[in-house]
Amino acid sequence: MVFTPEDRLGKQCLLLPLLLLAAWKVGSGQLHYSVPEEAKHGTFVGRIAQDLGLELAELVPRLFRMASKDREDLLEVNLQNGILFVNSRIDREELCGRSAECSIHLEVIVDRPLQVFHVDVEVRDINDNPPLFPVEEQRVLIYESRLPDSVFPLEGASDADVGSNSILTYKLSSSEYFGLDVKINSDDNKQIGLLLKKSLDREEAPAHNLFLTATDGGKPELTGTVQLLVTVLDVNDNAPTFEQSEYEVRIFENADNGTTVIRLNASDRDEGANGAISYSFNSLVAAMVIDHFSIDRNTGEIVIRGNLDFEQENLYKILIDATDKGHPPMAGHCTVLVRILDKNDNVPEIALTSLSLPVREDAQFGTVIALISVNDLDSGANGQVNCSLTPHVPFKLVSTFKNYYSLVLDSALDRESVSAYELVVTARDGGSPSLWATASLSVEVADMNDNAPAFAQPEYTVFVKENNPPGCHIFTVSARDADAQENALVSYSLVERRVGERALSSYISVHAESGKVYALQPLDHEELELLQFQVSARDAGVPPLGSNVTLQVFVLDENDNAPALLAPRVGGTGGAVSELVPRSLGAGQVVAKVRAVDADSGYNAWLSYELQPPASSARFPFRVGLYTGEISTTRVLDEADSPRHRLLVLVKDHGEPALTATATVLVSLVESGQAPKASSRASVGAAGPEAALVDVNVYLIIAICAVSSLLVLTLLLYTALRCSAPPTEGACTADKPTLVCSSAVGSWSYSQQRRQRVCSGEGPPKMDLMAFSPSLSPCPIMMGKAENQDLNEDHDAKPRQPNPDWRYSASLRAGMHSSVHLEEAGILRAGPGGPDQQWPTVSSATPEPEAGEVSPPVGAGVNSNSWTFKYGPGNPKQSGPGELPDKFIIPGSPAIISIRQEPTNSQIDKSDFITFGKKEETKKKKKKKKGNKTQEKKEKGNSTTDNSDQ
């Protein structure tokens, strides 16, 4: 059979009415249950399966289910036992509100066949809601003038329950003024009100606090409470009142205008405008009262508005009204009696006359400064006046007669300590209480020229480089004068003196106002190393006062002098030195010596010598000592050497920049028989050396004796002149001379007599002779002792090997014509803050560069005008404690003495040792080496041909 879609739709439409008809027949029955609200979960409601006639076994197969229009989760059926129970909390007020009937409608549906059952579950009300007022507190405003039995409506409470649970009864807390009025209106609701039982008085009780309680009819009873705040409103039923009906006030006659006489205070028990009080004079008050007094309407303060006078009126009677601002206004009254008291109302008067200002600081004690008069208009004790002065001042008051005083000087004045005094004169009368008056007086102290200008320190040390531009500023002196005005106006001037043959003002100028010191011309260190002078500072007072300050201007050396070659011993062409040298001369022999001097000092005068060898010669046979200038052979001369050599020696100082000079030495190689000088050098150490030196030593002895005699005569003459000459300002002191020594490492030590007189500007410079003190322990050198005197002694006093040859420099003669000064040696040490020049040192461990060459100078600047030691090769030995250092300097002469200790096995040649007036003739020894080696000789000191330079 084939069905079309239209056939299927027709059959479905026919089946639906049949099902609805069957369901209507089955569900025609209805069940009713009841359950209290707020029942717990699982509370039994009813056996719904049994009541519907269903078997428990068919509940699940027939798909037993339950539906509700309300919340479906409130009730549930247990399919195992068919019991309907409470599934969740049921709140009747939430479910049905305030409705009298409240039920839950359920539809129970089962299939096979389809059946629908209607079940109504009634929710019973329980008393679970207390009465509630709309607010926690109610405010009630009542005027105190309301009559008793007046009713004021109140807001009632409400209860969410129904039935007897919502029936409310009200109760008011106990009060003598209020009761509760309850009425039932047309809709059976209770209308409550507050009943006034007794008249109110705001001044006694401005507010009342009541409690209204509502109770429902449930079991158990539930209550609700609201607080009633009753505020009593004021009415103007009280007049202002004063504490007293009459007040008495005493006031002095000299009270100022605006002085408070009394402050009245009236009170009104009312509030607001009813209690606001204004004060005023009564209409019956006399005009005299209004002229002398006034009253503040708001505060009730009575003040003085006119001058009171005890002699005119001593009592005032004032009527006062206090009125509130109520309706109608009410007033209170009082009387104020003002009694005027007599008073010491006249302050002493002070008059200053005959002022003698300012006061000289040298004024005598008792000098009258001012006259003071006092006056008091009062009489009796009120008119008796005493005067006093500011304490701790050098003045006092002296009473001349009644009410007249003199201000006089009581102690010495010092304007520099206190330039002005502010005095306060106090006049006090004898009243009770007493009155006083003060007068200020400014006393200035006139300055007197009692303070000389003072410098910060008595001596200044200034360092100026030589060759300064003319007029350059070198220093500024400043003196302070404690005085004032013209007495403190300081002017500066130079204390004139002679500097050698010239006036000090030709060197130095001082600006009179600023104190700036200027060098008027370039200073020359070689001419003037120290310029010591004084600057005077004087004020403009009458008479003027002054003081001096000493300035020590040290002229610092600059390298402005190039080395100068000394005149050659034998004239040659073009200024060159010609030397004849035998070809048989061995290696290391001195053939010539270049001598040069440098007028500078320190490093600027430290000379070094360099030989410029020709470019064509690979084995040049000559060399020059770096610091000695001695030209010696480097090897044995042979026939291959050129017969003539032109040697160019470059002499250079150590300044910045270095300055140089060039010396030319012409060396001619000749046979031994053709050169006497060369043969004499070559014959040193031959069979008869003593015979070759006999004639030379004779001349040396004669020359030394002559020089010694001249020295003794000079010393005697100088001593006589110094003893007979009167002392002059700035003369040199006769302190012990200073011997300056260098230690083994080149440091300098000085004797206790640190400074000698530096005669810069004290007569002709460099004219004093300095003797060397032999008592100085650091430098145990004894001049003028006998032969074989050991110059170097150690702590054990063991004899040491004699010194090598001493050679008397040819240029020392120039130094003998001048005095020996510390400043000439370049080692001057000034006073506080003065210079301390230290020169480069050479360690005793430094290996010597070549034979016969003097090591670099240790100490001051060096030139050939010096004592010179000549020695053979070998390293210097460091001296032990108490021994004489390797090098020392004779102060006052640009000289260096080098003492070298030869090795034990070294060959030593000895020459003459020249001292001041004594001579030790040493012998020369010769040692020959085996083989065909050339015999080497080491010469200490100058050759005998050099004695002519002495």
From Swiss-Prot:
Comp. bias intervals (Basic and acidic residues): 909-923
Region (Disordered): 830-950
GO cellular component terms, semicolon-separated: extracellular region; plasma membrane
Signal peptide extent: 1-29
InterPro entries reported in the protein's UniProt record: Cadherin-like_dom, Cadherin-like_sf, Cadherin_CBD, Cadherin_CS, Cadherin_N, Protocadherin/Cadherin-CA
Swiss-Prot/TrEMBL PXXP repeat ranges: 799-802, 832-835, 873-876, 891-894
Residues with attached carbohydrate: 257, 265, 386, 548
Membrane-spanning intervals of the chain: 698-718
Residue ranges occupied by any Cadherin domain in the UniProt entry: 34-133, 157-242, 243-350, 351-455, 456-565, 581-678
Extracellular side: 30-697
Entry's Gene Ontology molecular function annotations: calcium ion binding
Topological domain ranges for the Cytoplasmic compartment: 719-950
GO biological process, one term: nervous system development
Region of interest called 4 X 4 AA repeats of P-X-X-P, as start-end residue ranges on this chain: 799-894
Keywords of the record: Calcium, Cell adhesion, Cell membrane, Glycoprotein, Membrane, Repeat, Secreted, Signal, Transmembrane, Transmembrane helix
Record function comment: Potential calcium-dependent cell-adhesion protein. May be involved in the establishment and maintenance of specific neuronal connections in the brain.
PANTHER family attached to this UniProt entry: CADHERIN-87A, PROTOCADHERIN ALPHA-6-RELATED
Name of the molecule in the record: Protocadherin alpha-6
Natural source organism: Homo sapiens (Human)
